[in-house]
């Protein structure tokens, strides 16, 4: 009794200490709107409302945790001084439930913060008293804690019953408090600055200004404590042991979650949940536009931008926009030249991880994607998808300008440049322009003579990968492409497409100069050089020039004496494939070229052309000496020999 009276007198003597008791609830700092008022707010105002309300709730939780730390310290101090101090009661009241005054938009945010705060309290509850234990030597704070001070967890209702004079005494009296000021007072005040001005106003009006000047000073000093959890690897410190454990994963590369199916390991539970869907095939997120399903919500969000056309990610260098952030990151490497993904086998680097994975299949020879129709295997999933179209005949990519259809999107994009006139890739040697960088790279090998693709069987090298693939079929004899009309087989898809035009009589390529039509683009390009006189292919031995690379290749064999084409019947060899084909008709008796006038057949196309001049009376070969004309070149040569003999006789 004497001690209580002395305490009461000492309180009365100190000015500003006799403050009224009361409680502060979330309702006191909440800004309430009716449903009608809420509907009048625009999205920006609603977002601001949620941010302010959530900040006030955080501040009250901050005060709650800090006052508990003060009470624990007061109890510890009592073990040394012997004073009996009632630190007051701190409670949460269930009367102020979220649903009483909060809209559904706020519930989710506050519940989420409540869960995070519980995690913080559970993992780091010992931390606030760490510094005080060192000063007081106390080992058991729970023995001195008041039974009524344990907070009751509720969803939202937060109240404080505090005897403020005792709190003020806690601040001003005792050596331990001074030691605490010296050890912790130098820490940053940023945490207390986060308390909103509105919350300070409410507290000041309800309890008086001394509460802010006394209690919050101690709250600041206690909460801005040292970080007791330090990493032995790098020395980085954390407030809570859970954060330290998560940080250790970056050093040890440990993974907490392992897939039971494939053994892959992950450091977060949500990642393994996503990964499991790869095995189960579960796709829970569905697009309302096209019905396509996805395993992750983020994938669905990116997919929706295909329908809306939204491309929120913009390159600062060239202004190009993208629908995905990862696509922008990969695009930026084109400007920086960065290639962070390196092959361990050959040291080649790539700008994308997917490109590295595809490249590794070259070394391993792995082809995990198999066609169910013909059993052919592929190293890339996209290649298998394109291959499937060969069986179905589907061409899903259509040009809006001319209705041309294509198997691949890249082919369509390349075709569109014909309409736009775009030709951004220019050869520095001959100024020729191309629609893609791959075409330019292939063209430049004409000037450099580079042939990087080599056959493992015979050692022959090629400037194009497609040419090497075609050459391989000569060794294997494989001809996977069959004509449905006549059953003829081909080793290349392009050859089958060209062959189909023979049945259809289609000749889509037309010369603008003479209106002559062709079934192949290469034939049209070769024909155009007749009008322009261009002969870009030059022999390095005799400097003779030719209109096509095939003509140059045939001519080169004149110098080398090479005759790679052999007849299976008589073993006769030839330096040109066309001559071999003509020779083989001698054995087979085949005469595929027929005259429409008289029905006569020939085994060579040139023989048919010469015969048709008999019906047309055309004589295109003219002698420069006497002006006489002939139907065939051989006849002209024979005639010119007569003039030569006369000149010899005159001499």
Swiss-Prot record:
Domain of life assignment: Eukaryota
Record-level Gene Ontology MF annotations: DNA-binding transcription factor activity, RNA polymerase II-specific; RNA polymerase II cis-regulatory region sequence-specific DNA binding; zinc ion binding
Stored CDD domains: KRAB_A-box
CC annotations in GO: nucleus
Gene Ontology biological-process entries: regulation of transcription by RNA polymerase II
Domain KRAB: 24-98
Entry keywords, A to Z: DNA-binding, Metal-binding, Nucleus, Repeat, Transcription, Transcription regulation, Zinc, Zinc-finger
Pfam families in the record: KRAB, zf-C2H2
Disulfide-bonded cysteines: none
Cell compartment(s), UniProt: Nucleus
Claim: Repeat is one of the keywords in the record: yes
PROSITE patterns: KRAB, ZINC_FINGER_C2H2_1, ZINC_FINGER_C2H2_2
PANTHER family in UniProt: ZINC FINGER PROTEIN (PTHR24408), ZINC FINGER PROTEIN 672-RELATED (PTHR24408:SF34)
Role summary: May be involved in transcriptional regulation.
Sequence similarity: Belongs to the krueppel C2H2-type zinc-finger protein family.
Listed name of the protein: Zinc finger protein 816
Organism: Homo sapiens
Gene: ZNF816
